[in-house]
Amino acid sequence: MATAPSVSYSMTVRLEVPASGTAVSQLTTAVESSGGSVTGLDVTASGHEKLRIDVTIAASSTAHADEIVEELRGIEGVTLGKVSDRTFLMHLGGKIEMASKHPIRNRDDLSMVYTPGVARVCMAIAENPEDARRLTIKRNSVAVVTDGSAVLGLGNIGPKAALPVMEGKAALFKRFAGIDAWPICLDTQDTDAIVEIVKAIAPGFAGINLEDISAPRCFEIEARLREALDIPVFHDDQHGTAIVVLAALTNALRVTGKAIENIRVVMSGAGAAGTAILKLLLAAGVKNAVVADIHGVVHAGREDLVDAAPGSALRWIADNTNLEGLTGTLKEAVRGADVFIGVSAPNVLDGDDVAAMADGAIVFALANPDPEVDPAIARQTAAVVATGRSDFPNQINNVLVFPGVFRGLLDAQSRTVNTEMMLAAATALADVVTEDELNPNYIIPSVFNDKVAGAVAGAVREAAKAAGATATTSQP
């Protein structure tokens, strides 16, 4: 599918052009004829003979941006100056910082913020460790932990290259939920080492957000940390995705008039996200689900599963899905299905496959940047279509969930996170979309809807209290 110009590949080009003539119209024509989009044009200096103009341009890729620059370079009378990649400019020096809540202006301030006054606070915590939540940043802090092994669609790029993503995650925590999140990029991909490191740093945090850790190690790491720690551990790639998918599916079913217990769901992808989505859907009431991976439909008799370990994710899928014992390919499995959910690879389905689904079909094609099926083609026969992309309606985006989930967990001083809390989060997110707003192109709210984080946080907080998972200490 063609890729439209995006702000992700936005650049500002400084040009000098003749003050008279058609140079300005020529450069806008050159950009648009090259497939780019002029999003801003600012005159930064003017004279009788020359104009200096900063042109902001959206391209579809770095190669496309280079092509546009070369087109501009070829315009007669135009002198090309500095070309700035706006995304890289935003990352210069990092995107986040630590800031003090109290000014340190004199010796009195210094004596209370640091020595000697701080010693009294330290001793108070030593006598009552629970006071760390009340007297330190712990109560509002989340560690965003990665080993860089499964970063976005980039793969195993390592901890340093993963840092910009973790910084971005921390910025989103602050923007949408007021949470102080700290990027922790570990230079090891050893499961035991990661578990021990996170256990060692846990005293400084009220929650752990695991991020971009490859499957199947992510399952073991999360399970062991949940067992060992008295703070919630949440692998967002699994559970954040699952919560948003369930919320979107809830509203898609409202659009189509189908009941969750009566639908047949076919999923493509049995990795971290796929497994978590499946578990949450089953907990929400789905009775009939089939999963396919690169080897085809997952079923108990499949050759590669006969000797699979009982505790493995794929074995669990085989034991808990595909009640009809289907075999074969994804394309065969999707025939007559009510719902398709893809968390796998581009273009595994086509328009004919979607047309072969049940009436009122729901298609969630979430692979990025290229979905499992072209959304424009899927819309020709499906009743509701969602993707992971921001340039189509119904974007399934984890930003809708993780800030509110952790806000609720931290406010409740929860010691864990469980399925009931995630179900509550999904229901709250779905309910942000009112009956008057609901339609096939609006089943999930915008990340900038100011009701989202509060609604999710409130639901998670109440679910944590109901589960008896909260600490007994009070906060001022």
List where the protein language model places each region.
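A conserved regulatory-domain signal marking ACT and ACT-like small-molecule sensing domains
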Residues: 1-92
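Flexible, glycine/charged-enriched surface loops at secondary-structure junctions
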Residues: 39-44, 81-83, 184, 211, ...
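Glycine/serine-rich phosphate-binding loop and adjoining beta1-alpha1 elements at the start
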Residues: 80-263
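General beta-strand structural signal in soluble alpha/beta enzymes
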Residues: 80-83, 183, 209-212, 233-236, ...
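Glycine-rich phosphate/diphosphate-binding loop of Rossmann-like nucleotide-binding domains
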Residues: 152, 159-177, 229, 235, ...
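Adenosine-phosphate binding glycine-rich loop
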Residues: 232, 236-237, 256, 365-474
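Rossmann-like adenosine-cofactor binding region
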Residues: 314-384, 389-391
